[in-house]
């Protein structure tokens, strides 16, 4: 499970021999998990699980979404048996709001602009981004970039605003990915 999960989810994970991950180590944790078992339940963020599995070379067809509100997660027995990763039908409300159209609009306005996104963004957003990384990775990547670069950042607004302030003296322009704002209630 994810580090920001509730204590009861962490306990559930521990009880069944699972492990807790962060966005920076999710791929390594999945590798460890597959060394223990042939199938992984990744929760609660489906997008982080999907992107991490994809980075490992697991085909999207080998990942299914488990909806806890439906009998058998809304899946057939065959889908469950065939899946390598079962993704819990959950997501971060902040990262969920970013859309591919935000990236397309940015690229049309700033062809030399660079897009960096958190792996909790949708698969489509991640695929269209130049870089994908944890919060710390986003900070390091933008700070290490050459001066006078323009960035579209797909993560929490306060982090983006702080980063923009930190690098503006280098001529870097950092902007929030979404045109609408949803503040994260858990950060």
Residue ranges and their predicted role:
Residues 1-187:
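The feature marks the mature, well-folded catalytic cores of soluble enzymes
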């Amino acid at each position: 499970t994810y580090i920001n999960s509730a204590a009861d989810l962490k306990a559930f994970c521990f009880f069944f021999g699972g492990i807790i991950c962060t966005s920076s180590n999710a791929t390594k944790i999945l590798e460890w998990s597959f060394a223990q078992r042939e199938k992984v339940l990744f929760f609660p963020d489906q997008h982080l699980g999907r992107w991490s599995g994809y980075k490992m070379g697991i085909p999207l067809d080998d990942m299914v979404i488990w909806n806890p509100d439906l009998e058998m997660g809304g899946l057939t027995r065959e889908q469950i048996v065939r899946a390598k990763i079962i993704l819990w039908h959950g997501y971060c409300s902040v990262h969920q709001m970013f859309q591919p159209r935000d990236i397309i609009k940015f690229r049309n306005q700033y062809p030399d602009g660079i897009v960096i996104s958190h792996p909790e963004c949708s698969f489509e957003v991640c695929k269209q981004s130049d870089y994908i990384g944890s919060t710390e990775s986003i900070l390091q990547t933008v700070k290490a970039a050459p001066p006078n670069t323009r960035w579209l950042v797909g993560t929490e607004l306060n982090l983006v605003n702080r980063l923009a302030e930190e690098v503006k003296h280098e001529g870097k322009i950092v902007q929030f990915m979404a045109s609408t704002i949803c503040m994260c209630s858990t950060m």
